Each structure stands twice: as C-alpha cells, then as structure tokens.
Amino acid sequence: MITRSLGKNGPTVGAIGLGCMGMSDFYGPADRSESIATIHAAMDAGITLIDTGDYYGMGHNELLIAEALKGKDRDRVVISVKYGGLRGPDRSWLGVDTRPAATKTFLAYTLQRLGTDHIDIYRPGRLDPNVPIEETVGAIADLVKGGYVHHVGLSEVGAETMRRANAVHPVADLQIEYSLISRGIEDEILPTCRQLGIGITAYGVLSRGLISGHWSKERTASPGDFRVHAPRFSTENIDRNLALVEALRALAGAKGVTVAQVAIAWVLAQGTDIVPLVGARRRDRLSEARGALTLSLTPDDHAAIERAVPRGAAAGPRYVAQQMAALDSERGRATAG
C-alpha cells in the first residue's frame, strides 16, 4: 500500500486508516468475529493506522483491538487513541475531562486494555473547556518523555487551539471530519495545519454512511444507532442529501466504480497530508474502500464532482445543535458545510 506521513512530526502510515468505533458503539450491534477479521484484513492489506477511543463502548473497542492484535507484531500498526470522553452506565455522555491527572490516568487504563507498553498517537477526543490546552498537551508531552506515548494528536479543534498546542509540543495530526459534504476545514483549519506541518486524519469521509451509496430512505437505523438523531438523516433532510448521492452515483457508474470509492478518492486527492479513516465493520466494505486507492480522478472528474456536490449542498449540520456548540473546530464559523 502507498504511504503518507502524518505531518512533519508524525509517523508514516498507510494512505487510509481503519476507524474502529462502529465495531463497538454508535451504529448498533456488530459481529465480533467479523470485526476482528476486518482488522486482520486491514493489516494484511497494508493498512497500519488503527484508530479508537477509550470511550468507544466504554473500553470495549480497545479490548476488541487487543484481541485482534494478539499474536501479531505490534510494530505493524500505529495505534491512535482518543480519550477524555466521560460516559455513564446508561451509555450517556457526561462531559470531557482532560486535566493532566486524568490524562495520565486514562492512558494507564488504555495501556492495560490494549496490552501494549505505548500508544503511537494520543489525543483528547474533544477540547475540555475547563482546562487550558497547554496543560493537556503538557501532560501528553510528559507521557512522550516517559516513552508511553510516541506522538501528540488533536481532535476537532480550531486553528487558534492548534497553534497554542503546537507551541507546547509538536503535534503530529489533527483528527477531524472531512468529506464531500463536510468541508468547513478548508477555510482556516486546513491552511493552519499546513502552515504548522500538522497532518490530517479525516473521519466521516462517507458521512456516517450517508454518501456511501448503500443508504436509502427506506433503511431503518438499528437500536443504538445514533443516526436516528443525526440531522442529515432526518425526514426533512434525507431526500435532498440522497439526491446528492444519486448525482455521485452517475459519475461513479461512468467510471465503473462505486459511490463510496469516489467519495474516498476525493478526500485522498485533497492532499498527501490527509489520511482518510474508513469505518468499515465488515471485510467487504473494507475491500470496497481500498478500491479508492487505485482510483485516479482527472481534472474533469473533479469538476464534475464539484458540480454534482457543491460545497454547502448538504441539508443539515453534521451533528445536533448541542454537539456542534461543543466543537472548538466550529466556533466562529457561519455554516457547517
């Protein structure tokens, strides 16, 4: 597999990464055996970046990855972990805690669950409004000095926060949503990353399956699937958004590829400093996503894609209002497109 560097300070990884969240949380039940087989298939295909969060399934996701990596060469993978999200026993969200003591405590439990002596990239999942980013990054920097963490990462923060964080310790990458229908980072965040030499790991490249080509208006989200409440999947927005998908389907059909492959290839084409995370829970979906790596989009293709899905064309924001308000990356932005 072709490789990309996560910024000037980060590791070299396969050009796409595997996001494991859906194997444990937010999308309804997943088949454990198939999830593990998918992780193995990703490794066999040369995918090295494995992304998780300690709050995905309240530790379940880390334990799942540990099981998948049992007997494997630890050096074959780059493990990215988000932390700081507080969960209740009813799976509710209770806020964020990235105080230095909490940062080190969360890591201790993560190392135990994953059965490893280090995490390659450690990042707060969200900005803690009660803790200066300098204190949070300073704590991770201490963990880097101790050998427990190799690189500092960030998630869903704005340009100013990135600058402040990077002044404390070099930041490898920013994990943030980026797709054909979520392009807000192009205004200020992406240029700032490039100025600072910070890479991008892009999640939501298929907008939670909305622009995968596999979603339909008739499809019903399973119990525990957060798309039940996602604005872009709502009754008032789904028709408009699926019309965009159909426009992409026509383009994909003309090239003999799938909608998902076009959407992922578009993200890949936005710069070699961007590594898309694909949230495949099954081997067939992973195989489809990998097909984007060999899809070359011509200038005419890009122009056609822009006409089919112009920036801001999607109906609805990427999260509900309360979640959007909590995103440092969205502060000061007029729109969420």
Regions found by a protein language model. Give the residues of each.
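Active-site beta-loop-alpha junctions enriched in small/polar residues
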Residues: M21-M23, G53-Y55, K82-L86, P124-L127, ...
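Terminal-tail/helix-coil boundary detector
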Residues: M1, Q195, R219, P223-A254, ...
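Aromatic-lined glycan-binding groove of carbohydrate-active enzymes
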Residues: I185-P223, T258
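Glycine-enriched alpha-helix->loop->beta-strand junction motifs that scaffold or abut catalytic
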Residues: N166-D173, R194-T201, T272-I274
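Glycine/proline-rich, positively charged
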Residues: D44, D90-G184, E188
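N-terminal small/glycine-rich loop or linker at the start of catalytic domains
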Residues: K8-Y27, S80-L94, H118, R123
